[in-house]
């Protein structure tokens, strides 16, 4: 009902829902696909909206092409397998929040998702990505989708206020900054509980520490701004708890 109401209020926009009735039961090999001529019609409208949004935000833009790199698809499936087997909660979240992942080739795109194509992740892996990069980007976009769903129930953030973004040079609407904070908190929460060994151990520790610093800086901007709803404030408190727990455990491990 909430989704139908959202669609009804946005009739001028092309809106697609990839969270179908049975999407959570589909296998990951079915849900992770490469963008190719035979499925072009399925994703053309989505990729057009991605291109328009990138240009609207004055970001560097390069055309989105088909992807013939099946190795990227295998890497994504490996990352999902690692996350899914790490915990039942993660497996449930992945299956219910991600309806489809489409792999494209685009120099200026990393990954993106939107409430306008709910449940779909558009991703453009790079040759130098490690398994860690795949995991982080999947969690990143999954977190955005989770928040889009929550915002169908409650806006969480008031409009008309601009704040500093941890991922952009220019100030962004408070909603975008709230999304950034939520993504950072989810990256910390999920990845801190993963076990990285060998060549991934140090980069994982460095990236998590960087994420914690960015989250602290980002959450501080919502203090005394009065731009969050009651539910939004509650979520900000939960993010603060994730940060505090990470900092506490990180300081203990440093002593040990």
Functional labels for PLM-detected ranges:
Residues 114, 128-136, 145-175:
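Post-HEXXH active-site segment of zinc metalloproteases
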Residues 53-117, 127:
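Auxiliary, metal-adjacent structural segments of Zn-dependent hydrolase domains
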Residues 62-73, 124-137, 169-180:
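Short, charged/polar micro-motifs that form catalytic or ligand-binding hotspots
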Residues 1-52:
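N-terminal low-structure segments adjacent to metalloprotease catalytic domains
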Residues 75-82, 86, 114-147, 242-256:
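Long, acidic, intrinsically disordered low-complexity segments
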Residues 162-199:
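Post-HExxH zinc-binding segment in Zn-dependent metallohydrolases
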Residues 93-95, 155-156, 197-207:
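Short, glycine/acidic-rich hinge or "gate" loops at secondary-structure transitions
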Residues 205-256:
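Pan-zinc metallopeptidase signature
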């Amino acid at each position: 009902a909430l989704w139908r109401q959202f669609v009804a209020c946005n009739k001028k926009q092309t809106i697609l829902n990839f969270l179908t009735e049975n999407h959570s039961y589909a296998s990951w090999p079915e849900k992770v696909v490469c963008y190719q001529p035979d499925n072009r019609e399925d994703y053309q409208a989505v990729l057009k909206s991605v291109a328009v949004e990138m240009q609207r935000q004055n970001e560097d833009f390069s055309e989105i092409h088909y992807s013939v790199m099946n190795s990227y698809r295998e890497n994504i499936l490996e990352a999902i397998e690692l996350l899914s087997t790490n915990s039942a909660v993660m497996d449930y979240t992945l299956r219910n929040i991600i309806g489809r992942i489409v792999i494209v080739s685009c120099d200026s795109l990393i990954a993106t998702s939107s409430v306008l194509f709910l449940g779909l992740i558009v991703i453009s892996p790079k040759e130098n990505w490690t398994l860690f990069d795949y995991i982080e980007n999947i969690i990143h976009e999954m977190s955005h989708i989770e928040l889009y769903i929550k915002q169908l129930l409650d806006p969480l953030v008031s409009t008309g206020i601009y704040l500093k973004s941890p991922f952009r040079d220019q100030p962004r609407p408070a909603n975008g900054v709230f999304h950034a904070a939520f993504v950072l908190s989810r990256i910390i929460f999920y990845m801190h509980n993963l076990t990285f060994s060998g060549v991934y151990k140090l980069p994982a520790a460095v990236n998590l520490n960087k994420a914690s610093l960015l989250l602290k800086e980002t959450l501080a901007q919502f203090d005394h701004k009065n731009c969050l709803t009651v539910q939004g404030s509650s979520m900000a408190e939960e993010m603060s708890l994730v940060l505090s727990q990470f900092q506490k455990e990180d300081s203990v491990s440093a002593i040990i």
